[in-house]
Every structure is written in C-alpha cells, then in structure tokens.
C-alpha cells in the first residue's frame, strides 16, 4: 500500500491584528487576533496555537491517554507553553504534580497575560515549570510519571 500527498496542505490567515510581539532572546513570539479563529500564537513564523482549535486538540491530547490509566497523579508535559494541556491535567482531582518542560518561559508569561486559564495554571501549587529542551530533560530525568504528554510541535530531536 502506498501513501502520497496529492496536494500540499497549508493554512493561510488574513486579517490578523497584532496583540503582542516579543523577541525573548531565544525565539520570536507573535500573539495575534483573527476575527473568526480568535487568538493565534506564532513562534519563529510557525503557528503554535489557534484559539478556535484549542479544545479539539488539547482535550484529546490529554484526556484520551488518561482514560486508559487507573489513576493519574503525576503528569509530564513536554512543550505546552500555551498551558492548555496543563490546564486540562489539573482538572483531575487525583493530580498531585504537573511538570511542564518548555524551552522558553516568555511563552508562558505571555499566555498568563492574555488567558485566564493560564493565570490559574501558573498559580496552582501542583504546577511546576522546568525551562529546558524537552529531549534533554527526558534524558536526564530520573523521576517517574503516570502520563507523559508531547505537546511539542517540533519532533526533530525525537527522531535523532
């Protein structure tokens, strides 16, 4: 059986208005607004988050694998600077710890300025942030987790 791409797939957005733009020293972060898709997060020219698709993506990303576990207490999220995956994880009453490993704290801070869910996550005592490359963190981490979520757009390090 052969699989091939008949047509290239792309998303072209017009009518974007800048809300905030940051050069964090690690990456260029743009936070914009679209009239029908809501807020859009772009990092280094790549779309990372579109508000209109958030529930479809993050609820499945977290709740589907969690449904196969008898009890979820410790969660590791690789990437996830939008904090939506962490927000979904913290909905579980059994959660003791959510560790989010993301490359750039500036993304979390930006989300905290613009989303109430992000403010909640950042203030939750069960939430812990590690500023690191996800692959490097996983290689060095001896801690065990019940659930590991890959909320990274780039998988290049995992392919090496």
Describe the role of every protein-language-model region.
Residues 1-40:
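N-terminal auxiliary segments of SAM/dcSAM-dependent transferases
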Residues 29, 48-49:
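Short, isolated positions in well-ordered beta-strands
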Residues 1-4, 24-26, 52-160:
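The AdoMet/dcAdoMet-binding core of the Class I SAM-like
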Residues 43-45:
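Short strand-turn-strand beta-turns centered on an Asx-Gly dipeptide
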């Amino acid at each position: 059986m052969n699989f091939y791409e008949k047509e290239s797939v792309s998303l072209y957005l017009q009518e974007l208005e800048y809300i905030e733009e940051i050069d964090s020293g690690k990456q260029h972060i743009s936070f914009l607004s679209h009239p029908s898709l809501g807020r859009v997060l772009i990092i280094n020219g790549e779309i990372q988050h579109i508000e209109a698709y958030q529930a479809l993506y993050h609820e499945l990303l977290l709740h589907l694998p969690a449904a196969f576990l008898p009890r979820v207490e410790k969660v590791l999220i690789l990437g996830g600077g939008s904090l939506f995956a962490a927000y979904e994880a913290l909905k579980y009453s059994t959660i003791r710890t959510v560790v989010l490993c993301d490359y750039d704290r500036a993304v979390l801070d930006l989300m905290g300025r613009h989303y109430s869910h992000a403010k909640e996550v950042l203030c939750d005592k069960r939430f812990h942030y590690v500023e690191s490359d996800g692959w490097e963190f996983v290689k060095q981490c001896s801690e065990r987790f019940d659930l590991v979520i890959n909320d990274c757009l780039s998988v290049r390090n995992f392919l090496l």
